[in-house]
Amino acid sequence: MTALSESEVLNDKEFPSSRQLKWILAFLCLYFGLRLLFFALFISPYIPPDEVTHLGLAKIFSKVLLLPENSVETYQYGLVTNISWLYYWVMGKLLPLNVFGISDLLFLRLFNVLFAFGTVFFSWRLLRLLTDDRLTQLLLVVVMTNTLMFSFLSGSVSYDNLVNLLAVMAIYYLFAFFKERSVGFLAISFLCQLAGCLAKLSFLPLALILVALWVLREVKGVRLLPVAVKRYCRATGWRTYLLSFAILAGLSLNIQLYGGNYLQYGSLRPSMYEVLSPDIALEHRISARDMIVEYFKDGRLSYQQAIQRTRFISHQGDRADTVYLIQRLADHRVNGYEMLGPVAYIVPWGEHIAATVFGIKGHLSMLNKGLTIVPVAVLMLLALLGSVMSWRRGTQAGIAAHLALLCGAYAIFLMYAHNYKLYLYYENFSMALQGRYVFPVMGAFYVCFSYYLMCLFRRESLRLGLAISAAFVFISLDFPFFLYHATRNWFGLLPPFF
Protein backbone atom coordinates (compact mmCIF):
# COMPACT_ATOMS: atom_id res chain seq x y z
CA MET A 1 0.00 0.00 0.00
CA THR A 2 1.48 3.33 -1.08
CA ALA A 3 1.44 6.36 1.14
CA LEU A 4 -0.82 9.26 0.24
CA SER A 5 0.87 12.29 -1.23
CA GLU A 6 0.80 15.57 0.68
CA SER A 7 -1.69 17.08 -1.79
CA GLU A 8 -4.02 14.08 -1.39
CA VAL A 9 -3.89 14.37 2.40
CA LEU A 10 -4.69 18.08 2.26
CA ASN A 11 -7.45 17.50 -0.29
CA ASP A 12 -9.06 14.87 1.93
CA LYS A 13 -9.38 17.45 4.72
CA GLU A 14 -11.77 19.49 2.57
CA PHE A 15 -15.49 18.91 2.89
CA PRO A 16 -16.61 16.38 2.05
CA SER A 17 -13.77 14.00 2.78
CA SER A 18 -13.80 10.56 1.17
CA ARG A 19 -15.38 9.07 4.27
CA GLN A 20 -17.97 11.84 4.57
CA LEU A 21 -18.83 11.47 0.89
CA LYS A 22 -19.64 7.78 1.32
CA TRP A 23 -21.85 8.40 4.35
CA ILE A 24 -23.74 11.29 2.78
CA LEU A 25 -24.27 9.39 -0.47
CA ALA A 26 -25.58 6.42 1.52
CA PHE A 27 -27.99 8.70 3.39
CA LEU A 28 -29.21 10.32 0.16
CA CYS A 29 -29.82 6.91 -1.41
CA LEU A 30 -31.67 5.73 1.71
CA TYR A 31 -33.84 8.86 1.70
CA PHE A 32 -34.51 8.37 -2.02
CA GLY A 33 -35.44 4.73 -1.50
CA LEU A 34 -37.83 5.48 1.36
CA ARG A 35 -39.63 8.12 -0.69
CA LEU A 36 -39.98 5.78 -3.66
CA LEU A 37 -41.30 3.09 -1.33
CA PHE A 38 -43.87 5.60 -0.05
CA PHE A 39 -45.01 6.36 -3.60
CA ALA A 40 -45.08 2.65 -4.48
CA LEU A 41 -47.17 1.78 -1.41
CA PHE A 42 -49.63 4.64 -1.17
CA ILE A 43 -50.23 6.30 -4.56
CA SER A 44 -53.42 5.32 -6.35
CA PRO A 45 -52.77 3.41 -9.61
CA TYR A 46 -55.11 5.83 -11.39
CA ILE A 47 -52.75 8.79 -10.88
CA PRO A 48 -49.36 7.96 -12.54
CA PRO A 49 -49.30 8.34 -16.35
CA ASP A 50 -51.04 5.34 -17.97
CA GLU A 51 -50.06 3.00 -15.13
CA VAL A 52 -53.20 0.88 -15.45
CA THR A 53 -52.43 0.37 -19.14
CA HIS A 54 -48.79 -0.52 -18.46
CA LEU A 55 -49.82 -3.03 -15.79
CA GLY A 56 -52.48 -4.54 -18.05
CA LEU A 57 -50.04 -4.97 -20.93
CA ALA A 58 -47.45 -6.54 -18.61
CA LYS A 59 -50.04 -9.12 -17.51
CA ILE A 60 -50.88 -9.90 -21.14
CA PHE A 61 -47.20 -10.37 -22.00
CA SER A 62 -46.80 -12.64 -18.96
CA LYS A 63 -49.16 -15.19 -20.52
CA VAL A 64 -47.02 -15.91 -23.60
CA LEU A 65 -43.41 -16.92 -24.11
CA LEU A 66 -42.59 -14.42 -26.86
CA LEU A 67 -45.01 -11.74 -28.09
CA PRO A 68 -48.83 -11.78 -27.83
CA GLU A 69 -51.39 -11.15 -30.55
CA ASN A 70 -54.21 -8.60 -30.55
CA SER A 71 -57.43 -10.04 -29.15
CA VAL A 72 -60.66 -9.06 -27.46
CA GLU A 73 -58.81 -9.26 -24.14
CA THR A 74 -56.16 -6.76 -25.27
CA TYR A 75 -58.26 -4.15 -27.10
CA GLN A 76 -58.84 -2.01 -24.00
CA TYR A 77 -55.05 -1.51 -23.67
CA GLY A 78 -54.42 -0.61 -27.31
CA LEU A 79 -52.16 -2.51 -29.67
CA VAL A 80 -49.95 -5.32 -28.40
CA THR A 81 -48.40 -5.81 -31.83
CA ASN A 82 -46.57 -3.17 -33.89
CA ILE A 83 -45.45 -1.42 -30.68
CA SER A 84 -42.21 -0.96 -28.74
CA TRP A 85 -42.56 -4.05 -26.57
CA LEU A 86 -39.37 -4.57 -24.53
CA TYR A 87 -40.60 -3.06 -21.25
CA TYR A 88 -43.82 -5.08 -21.27
CA TRP A 89 -41.93 -8.26 -22.14
CA VAL A 90 -39.50 -7.76 -19.23
CA MET A 91 -42.28 -6.93 -16.77
CA GLY A 92 -44.33 -9.86 -18.03
CA LYS A 93 -41.45 -12.28 -17.45
CA LEU A 94 -41.01 -10.92 -13.91
CA LEU A 95 -44.64 -11.36 -12.88
CA PRO A 96 -44.43 -15.18 -12.41
CA LEU A 97 -41.72 -14.49 -9.80
CA ASN A 98 -44.27 -12.78 -7.57
CA VAL A 99 -44.63 -15.47 -4.92
CA PHE A 100 -44.65 -13.05 -1.99
CA GLY A 101 -48.39 -12.58 -1.59
CA ILE A 102 -48.31 -8.94 -2.68
CA SER A 103 -50.23 -7.46 -5.60
CA ASP A 104 -48.74 -7.51 -9.08
CA LEU A 105 -48.92 -3.70 -9.04
CA LEU A 106 -46.69 -3.36 -5.98
CA PHE A 107 -44.35 -6.10 -7.22
CA LEU A 108 -43.71 -4.30 -10.51
CA ARG A 109 -43.51 -0.91 -8.81
CA LEU A 110 -40.65 -2.21 -6.67
CA PHE A 111 -38.77 -3.43 -9.74
CA ASN A 112 -39.21 0.01 -11.30
CA VAL A 113 -37.56 1.47 -8.21
CA LEU A 114 -34.46 -0.54 -9.13
CA PHE A 115 -34.47 1.06 -12.59
CA ALA A 116 -34.45 4.49 -10.91
CA PHE A 117 -31.45 3.60 -8.75
CA GLY A 118 -29.67 2.36 -11.86
CA THR A 119 -30.37 5.68 -13.58
CA VAL A 120 -28.87 7.60 -10.65
CA PHE A 121 -25.86 5.27 -10.51
CA PHE A 122 -24.95 5.64 -14.19
CA SER A 123 -25.49 9.40 -14.02
CA TRP A 124 -22.94 9.46 -11.19
CA ARG A 125 -20.55 7.33 -13.26
CA LEU A 126 -21.02 9.74 -16.16
CA LEU A 127 -19.98 12.62 -13.92
CA ARG A 128 -16.90 10.67 -12.81
CA LEU A 129 -15.73 10.67 -16.44
CA LEU A 130 -15.68 14.44 -16.15
CA THR A 131 -14.45 15.14 -12.62
CA ASP A 132 -13.62 13.48 -9.30
CA ASP A 133 -14.62 16.56 -7.33
CA ARG A 134 -16.53 15.25 -4.33
CA LEU A 135 -18.73 18.30 -3.81
CA THR A 136 -19.90 18.08 -7.43
CA GLN A 137 -20.68 14.38 -6.93
CA LEU A 138 -22.82 15.17 -3.90
CA LEU A 139 -24.69 17.90 -5.74
CA LEU A 140 -25.42 15.61 -8.67
CA VAL A 141 -26.89 12.88 -6.46
CA VAL A 142 -28.98 15.45 -4.58
CA VAL A 143 -30.56 16.90 -7.73
CA MET A 144 -31.03 13.49 -9.37
CA THR A 145 -32.83 12.05 -6.35
CA ASN A 146 -34.86 15.20 -5.59
CA THR A 147 -36.63 15.98 -8.86
CA LEU A 148 -40.31 15.47 -8.09
CA MET A 149 -41.63 14.02 -11.36
CA PHE A 150 -38.66 11.64 -11.58
CA SER A 151 -39.22 10.50 -7.98
CA PHE A 152 -42.96 10.08 -8.51
CA LEU A 153 -42.56 8.21 -11.79
CA SER A 154 -39.87 5.95 -10.34
CA GLY A 155 -42.36 4.56 -7.82
CA SER A 156 -44.87 3.61 -10.51
CA VAL A 157 -45.14 1.09 -13.35
CA SER A 158 -43.96 2.96 -16.45
CA TYR A 159 -41.85 2.16 -19.48
CA ASP A 160 -40.17 5.52 -18.97
CA ASN A 161 -38.21 4.05 -16.05
CA LEU A 162 -36.52 1.45 -18.26
CA VAL A 163 -36.03 4.00 -21.03
CA ASN A 164 -34.35 6.46 -18.64
CA LEU A 165 -31.94 3.75 -17.46
CA LEU A 166 -31.05 2.58 -20.97
CA ALA A 167 -30.61 6.19 -22.11
CA VAL A 168 -28.10 7.15 -19.41
CA MET A 169 -26.29 3.83 -19.90
CA ALA A 170 -26.03 4.45 -23.65
CA ILE A 171 -24.68 7.95 -23.01
CA TYR A 172 -22.26 6.81 -20.32
CA TYR A 173 -20.73 3.98 -22.34
CA LEU A 174 -20.38 6.16 -25.44
CA PHE A 175 -18.53 8.85 -23.48
CA ALA A 176 -16.50 6.18 -21.67
CA PHE A 177 -15.43 5.01 -25.13
CA PHE A 178 -14.43 8.57 -26.03
CA LYS A 179 -12.25 8.72 -22.92
CA GLU A 180 -10.93 5.15 -22.56
CA ARG A 181 -10.98 4.11 -26.26
CA SER A 182 -12.41 0.69 -25.37
CA VAL A 183 -14.36 -0.92 -28.21
CA GLY A 184 -16.29 -2.87 -25.59
CA PHE A 185 -17.75 0.36 -24.20
CA LEU A 186 -18.83 1.39 -27.69
CA ALA A 187 -20.50 -1.98 -28.27
CA ILE A 188 -22.41 -1.76 -24.97
CA SER A 189 -23.56 1.76 -25.89
CA PHE A 190 -24.91 0.52 -29.22
CA LEU A 191 -26.64 -2.38 -27.46
CA CYS A 192 -28.31 -0.01 -24.97
CA GLN A 193 -29.44 2.21 -27.83
CA LEU A 194 -31.01 -0.73 -29.66
CA ALA A 195 -32.71 -1.92 -26.47
CA GLY A 196 -33.99 1.59 -25.78
CA CYS A 197 -35.55 1.80 -29.24
CA LEU A 198 -37.39 -1.47 -28.52
CA ALA A 199 -38.66 0.01 -25.24
CA LYS A 200 -40.08 3.28 -26.59
CA LEU A 201 -40.32 4.99 -29.97
CA SER A 202 -39.09 8.32 -28.57
CA PHE A 203 -35.68 6.71 -27.96
CA LEU A 204 -35.03 6.74 -31.72
CA PRO A 205 -34.04 10.44 -31.93
CA LEU A 206 -31.68 10.05 -28.96
CA ALA A 207 -30.05 7.05 -30.64
CA LEU A 208 -29.66 9.03 -33.88
CA ILE A 209 -28.06 11.94 -32.00
CA LEU A 210 -25.65 9.60 -30.20
CA VAL A 211 -24.64 7.91 -33.45
CA ALA A 212 -24.18 11.31 -35.13
CA LEU A 213 -22.03 12.49 -32.21
CA TRP A 214 -19.91 9.33 -32.47
CA VAL A 215 -19.45 9.76 -36.23
CA LEU A 216 -18.51 13.45 -35.92
CA ARG A 217 -15.97 12.74 -33.18
CA GLU A 218 -14.46 9.67 -34.78
CA VAL A 219 -14.54 10.62 -38.47
CA LYS A 220 -10.80 11.31 -38.51
CA GLY A 221 -9.92 8.03 -36.83
CA VAL A 222 -12.37 5.80 -38.68
CA ARG A 223 -9.49 4.01 -40.43
CA LEU A 224 -8.18 2.84 -37.06
CA LEU A 225 -11.51 1.34 -35.98
CA PRO A 226 -11.11 -2.09 -37.72
CA VAL A 227 -7.69 -2.52 -36.11
CA ALA A 228 -9.11 -1.64 -32.69
CA VAL A 229 -12.00 -4.08 -33.19
CA LYS A 230 -9.62 -6.91 -34.14
CA ARG A 231 -7.45 -6.20 -31.10
CA TYR A 232 -10.50 -6.18 -28.85
CA CYS A 233 -11.78 -9.47 -30.30
CA ARG A 234 -8.46 -11.20 -29.65
CA ALA A 235 -8.35 -9.90 -26.08
CA THR A 236 -11.92 -10.72 -25.03
CA GLY A 237 -12.74 -13.94 -26.88
CA TRP A 238 -16.25 -15.29 -26.22
CA ARG A 239 -17.50 -11.97 -24.83
CA THR A 240 -17.00 -10.44 -28.27
CA TYR A 241 -19.22 -13.05 -29.88
CA LEU A 242 -21.86 -12.60 -27.19
CA LEU A 243 -21.93 -8.82 -27.65
CA SER A 244 -21.91 -9.15 -31.43
CA PHE A 245 -24.84 -11.57 -31.34
CA ALA A 246 -26.79 -9.29 -28.98
CA ILE A 247 -26.20 -6.26 -31.23
CA LEU A 248 -27.21 -8.15 -34.38
CA ALA A 249 -30.32 -9.48 -32.62
CA GLY A 250 -31.24 -5.99 -31.40
CA LEU A 251 -30.70 -4.51 -34.85
CA SER A 252 -32.81 -7.25 -36.47
CA LEU A 253 -35.66 -6.76 -34.01
CA ASN A 254 -35.65 -3.00 -34.59
CA ILE A 255 -35.70 -3.47 -38.36
CA GLN A 256 -38.50 -6.00 -38.03
CA LEU A 257 -40.57 -3.64 -35.85
CA TYR A 258 -40.01 -0.20 -37.34
CA GLY A 259 -39.13 -1.27 -40.86
CA GLY A 260 -42.15 -3.56 -40.96
CA ASN A 261 -44.44 -0.82 -39.67
CA TYR A 262 -43.17 1.69 -42.20
CA LEU A 263 -43.43 -0.69 -45.16
CA GLN A 264 -46.91 -1.87 -44.25
CA TYR A 265 -48.49 1.29 -42.83
CA GLY A 266 -46.20 4.15 -43.88
CA SER A 267 -45.54 5.02 -40.24
CA LEU A 268 -43.09 3.92 -37.55
CA ARG A 269 -45.98 3.69 -35.09
CA PRO A 270 -49.29 2.98 -36.85
CA SER A 271 -52.58 3.81 -35.19
CA MET A 272 -54.78 1.12 -33.74
CA TYR A 273 -57.50 1.81 -36.29
CA GLU A 274 -54.97 1.34 -39.10
CA VAL A 275 -53.78 -2.05 -37.82
CA LEU A 276 -57.21 -3.35 -36.75
CA SER A 277 -60.39 -1.39 -37.49
CA PRO A 278 -62.07 1.88 -36.45
CA ASP A 279 -64.72 0.01 -34.46
CA ILE A 280 -62.11 -1.91 -32.47
CA ALA A 281 -60.05 1.25 -31.92
CA LEU A 282 -63.01 2.80 -30.09
CA GLU A 283 -62.41 0.30 -27.27
CA HIS A 284 -59.09 1.98 -26.39
CA ARG A 285 -59.39 5.45 -24.88
CA ILE A 286 -56.34 7.08 -26.53
CA SER A 287 -56.90 5.45 -29.93
CA ALA A 288 -60.55 6.51 -29.80
CA ARG A 289 -59.60 10.09 -28.98
CA ASP A 290 -57.03 10.30 -31.77
CA MET A 291 -59.34 8.73 -34.35
CA ILE A 292 -62.36 10.88 -33.49
CA VAL A 293 -60.31 14.10 -33.55
CA GLU A 294 -58.62 13.12 -36.83
CA TYR A 295 -61.94 12.28 -38.49
CA PHE A 296 -63.42 15.57 -37.29
CA LYS A 297 -60.46 17.60 -38.56
CA ASP A 298 -60.59 15.82 -41.93
CA GLY A 299 -64.31 16.43 -42.29
CA ARG A 300 -65.26 12.76 -42.13
CA LEU A 301 -67.31 13.49 -39.02
CA SER A 302 -69.48 16.50 -38.33
CA TYR A 303 -69.38 18.23 -34.98
CA GLN A 304 -72.46 16.39 -33.73
CA GLN A 305 -71.21 13.03 -35.02
CA ALA A 306 -67.83 13.53 -33.34
CA ILE A 307 -69.45 14.43 -30.01
CA GLN A 308 -71.69 11.36 -30.27
CA ARG A 309 -68.71 9.10 -30.96
CA THR A 310 -67.12 10.13 -27.66
CA ARG A 311 -69.75 8.09 -25.80
CA PHE A 312 -67.73 5.00 -26.70
CA ILE A 313 -64.88 6.25 -24.47
CA SER A 314 -65.62 4.64 -21.13
CA HIS A 315 -63.13 6.66 -19.05
CA GLN A 316 -64.89 9.84 -17.94
CA GLY A 317 -61.75 11.99 -17.90
CA ASP A 318 -60.60 10.89 -21.35
CA ARG A 319 -64.09 11.40 -22.73
CA ALA A 320 -64.17 14.94 -21.32
CA ASP A 321 -60.73 15.67 -22.81
CA THR A 322 -61.87 14.49 -26.24
CA VAL A 323 -65.03 16.60 -26.09
CA TYR A 324 -62.91 19.60 -25.09
CA LEU A 325 -60.57 19.09 -28.06
CA ILE A 326 -63.50 18.84 -30.49
CA GLN A 327 -65.19 21.93 -29.06
CA ARG A 328 -61.92 23.87 -29.17
CA LEU A 329 -61.27 22.94 -32.81
CA ALA A 330 -64.85 23.84 -33.74
CA ASP A 331 -64.54 27.21 -32.01
CA HIS A 332 -61.28 27.94 -33.82
CA ARG A 333 -62.96 27.24 -37.16
CA VAL A 334 -65.56 29.89 -36.44
CA ASN A 335 -63.62 32.52 -34.51
CA GLY A 336 -60.06 31.82 -35.65
CA TYR A 337 -57.06 31.20 -33.43
CA GLU A 338 -53.63 32.79 -33.49
CA MET A 339 -51.01 30.06 -33.18
CA LEU A 340 -47.62 30.65 -31.61
CA GLY A 341 -44.72 30.81 -34.04
CA PRO A 342 -41.68 28.55 -33.65
CA VAL A 343 -39.68 31.22 -31.79
CA ALA A 344 -42.55 32.42 -29.59
CA TYR A 345 -43.20 28.79 -28.63
CA ILE A 346 -39.83 28.36 -26.89
CA VAL A 347 -40.48 30.25 -23.63
CA PRO A 348 -43.92 28.79 -22.80
CA TRP A 349 -42.62 25.34 -23.77
CA GLY A 350 -39.72 25.71 -21.32
CA GLU A 351 -42.02 27.00 -18.57
CA HIS A 352 -44.40 24.06 -18.94
CA ILE A 353 -41.57 21.54 -19.05
CA ALA A 354 -40.14 22.99 -15.83
CA ALA A 355 -43.58 23.01 -14.18
CA THR A 356 -44.02 19.31 -14.94
CA VAL A 357 -40.45 18.24 -14.12
CA PHE A 358 -40.38 19.90 -10.70
CA GLY A 359 -44.08 19.20 -10.28
CA ILE A 360 -46.20 16.23 -11.37
CA LYS A 361 -48.29 15.63 -14.46
CA GLY A 362 -50.34 12.47 -14.53
CA HIS A 363 -54.07 11.80 -14.39
CA LEU A 364 -53.93 14.34 -11.58
CA SER A 365 -51.51 17.24 -11.82
CA MET A 366 -49.41 19.12 -9.30
CA LEU A 367 -47.69 21.79 -11.38
CA ASN A 368 -44.81 23.78 -9.95
CA LYS A 369 -45.29 27.31 -11.22
CA GLY A 370 -44.85 30.86 -10.00
CA LEU A 371 -42.51 31.84 -7.18
CA THR A 372 -41.62 28.28 -6.18
CA ILE A 373 -39.90 27.59 -9.50
CA VAL A 374 -37.88 30.84 -9.43
CA PRO A 375 -35.00 29.44 -7.29
CA VAL A 376 -34.53 26.61 -9.82
CA ALA A 377 -34.44 29.12 -12.67
CA VAL A 378 -31.83 31.18 -10.80
CA LEU A 379 -29.66 28.10 -10.26
CA MET A 380 -29.91 27.20 -13.95
CA LEU A 381 -28.80 30.71 -14.89
CA LEU A 382 -25.88 30.48 -12.46
CA ALA A 383 -24.85 27.16 -14.03
CA LEU A 384 -25.00 28.81 -17.44
CA LEU A 385 -22.82 31.63 -16.12
CA GLY A 386 -20.45 29.00 -14.73
CA SER A 387 -20.13 27.43 -18.19
CA VAL A 388 -19.23 30.82 -19.67
CA MET A 389 -16.64 31.45 -16.96
CA SER A 390 -15.22 27.96 -17.44
CA TRP A 391 -14.85 28.68 -21.15
CA ARG A 392 -13.17 32.04 -20.50
CA ARG A 393 -10.73 30.46 -18.04
CA GLY A 394 -9.83 27.84 -20.62
CA THR A 395 -10.97 25.01 -18.33
CA GLN A 396 -13.96 24.01 -20.46
CA ALA A 397 -14.06 20.21 -20.41
CA GLY A 398 -14.72 18.56 -23.76
CA ILE A 399 -17.00 15.93 -22.22
CA ALA A 400 -19.18 18.59 -20.57
CA ALA A 401 -19.44 20.57 -23.81
CA HIS A 402 -20.47 17.49 -25.77
CA LEU A 403 -23.00 16.52 -23.11
CA ALA A 404 -24.49 20.00 -23.30
CA LEU A 405 -24.65 19.69 -27.09
CA LEU A 406 -26.38 16.33 -26.75
CA CYS A 407 -28.99 17.72 -24.34
CA GLY A 408 -29.61 20.74 -26.54
CA ALA A 409 -30.06 18.66 -29.68
CA TYR A 410 -32.51 16.31 -27.95
CA ALA A 411 -34.50 19.21 -26.47
CA ILE A 412 -34.77 20.93 -29.86
CA PHE A 413 -35.91 17.71 -31.51
CA LEU A 414 -38.48 17.09 -28.78
CA MET A 415 -39.72 20.67 -28.89
CA TYR A 416 -40.25 20.97 -32.62
CA ALA A 417 -40.54 17.45 -34.06
CA HIS A 418 -42.94 16.29 -31.34
CA ASN A 419 -44.49 18.97 -29.13
CA TYR A 420 -44.82 21.83 -31.61
CA LYS A 421 -46.11 19.45 -34.28
CA LEU A 422 -48.86 18.21 -31.94
CA TYR A 423 -49.62 21.79 -30.88
CA LEU A 424 -50.24 22.77 -34.50
CA TYR A 425 -52.35 19.67 -35.16
CA TYR A 426 -54.58 19.75 -32.07
CA GLU A 427 -54.42 23.55 -31.62
CA ASN A 428 -53.90 22.82 -27.93
CA PHE A 429 -50.71 23.96 -26.21
CA SER A 430 -50.52 21.34 -23.46
CA MET A 431 -51.29 18.33 -25.67
CA ALA A 432 -48.75 15.58 -24.82
CA LEU A 433 -46.46 18.23 -23.32
CA GLN A 434 -44.90 16.63 -20.25
CA GLY A 435 -41.61 17.09 -18.47
CA ARG A 436 -40.94 13.35 -18.24
CA TYR A 437 -40.24 13.32 -21.97
CA VAL A 438 -36.89 15.05 -21.31
CA PHE A 439 -35.82 12.41 -18.76
CA PRO A 440 -33.76 10.37 -21.26
CA VAL A 441 -31.19 13.20 -21.12
CA MET A 442 -31.87 14.24 -17.51
CA GLY A 443 -28.74 12.50 -16.24
CA ALA A 444 -26.56 14.17 -18.85
CA PHE A 445 -28.21 17.54 -18.19
CA TYR A 446 -27.72 17.31 -14.43
CA VAL A 447 -24.08 16.30 -14.92
CA CYS A 448 -23.57 19.53 -16.88
CA PHE A 449 -25.61 21.52 -14.36
CA SER A 450 -23.67 20.23 -11.34
CA TYR A 451 -20.29 20.58 -13.01
CA TYR A 452 -20.81 24.11 -14.31
CA LEU A 453 -22.49 25.34 -11.13
CA MET A 454 -19.45 24.25 -9.13
CA CYS A 455 -17.21 25.96 -11.72
CA LEU A 456 -18.75 29.31 -10.85
CA PHE A 457 -16.44 29.88 -7.87
CA ARG A 458 -12.95 28.70 -7.01
CA ARG A 459 -13.00 29.46 -3.29
CA GLU A 460 -14.14 26.37 -1.39
CA SER A 461 -16.33 28.27 1.07
CA LEU A 462 -18.31 29.85 -1.78
CA ARG A 463 -18.61 26.54 -3.63
CA LEU A 464 -19.86 24.85 -0.46
CA GLY A 465 -22.40 27.61 0.21
CA LEU A 466 -23.70 27.40 -3.35
CA ALA A 467 -23.96 23.61 -3.20
CA ILE A 468 -25.87 23.73 0.11
CA SER A 469 -28.25 26.36 -1.29
CA ALA A 470 -28.89 24.28 -4.41
CA ALA A 471 -29.43 21.15 -2.32
CA PHE A 472 -31.94 22.97 -0.11
CA VAL A 473 -33.90 24.17 -3.15
CA PHE A 474 -34.11 20.74 -4.78
CA ILE A 475 -34.86 18.82 -1.58
CA SER A 476 -37.63 21.23 -0.55
CA LEU A 477 -39.24 21.08 -4.01
CA ASP A 478 -39.44 17.29 -3.97
CA PHE A 479 -41.15 15.42 -1.13
CA PRO A 480 -42.05 18.44 1.06
CA PHE A 481 -43.65 20.11 -1.99
CA PHE A 482 -45.63 16.94 -2.69
CA LEU A 483 -46.84 16.49 0.89
CA TYR A 484 -47.90 20.14 1.08
CA HIS A 485 -50.02 19.98 -2.09
CA ALA A 486 -51.30 16.38 -2.11
CA THR A 487 -54.95 15.72 -1.28
CA ARG A 488 -56.60 12.42 -0.40
CA ASN A 489 -57.42 11.95 -4.10
CA TRP A 490 -53.78 11.06 -4.72
CA PHE A 491 -53.85 8.05 -2.45
CA GLY A 492 -55.43 4.64 -2.84
CA LEU A 493 -55.61 1.40 -0.94
CA LEU A 494 -52.32 -0.25 -0.11
CA PRO A 495 -51.40 -2.28 -3.23
CA PRO A 496 -51.08 -5.60 -1.32
CA PHE A 497 -54.82 -5.36 -0.64
CA PHE A 498 -55.76 -3.64 -3.91
Region annotations inferred by a language model:
Residues 35-40, 52-82, 86, 94, ...:
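Extracytosolic helix-loop segments that constitute the early lumenal/periplasmic catalytic or substrate-binding loops
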Residues 107-131, 169, 382-385:
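Transmembrane-helix motifs of polytopic, lipid-linked glycan transferases
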Residues 81, 85, 89, 98-118:
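Loop-to-helix entry region of an early transmembrane alpha helix in multi-pass inner-membrane enzymes
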Residues 128-131, 170-185, 196, 218:
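Membrane-interface transmembrane helices that cradle and orient dolichyl/undecaprenyl
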Residues 1-37, 218-222, 227-249, 388-404, ...:
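Start-transfer (signal-anchor) and selected internal transmembrane alpha helices
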Residues 20-51, 59-65, 246-262, 409-413, ...:
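Transmembrane signal-anchor helices characteristic of membrane glycosylation enzymes that use polyprenol
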Residues 216-217, 237-382:
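Membrane-lumen/periplasm interface segments of specific transmembrane helices
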Residues 102-106, 123-146, 165, 463:
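Transmembrane-helix signature of polytopic, membrane-embedded enzymes
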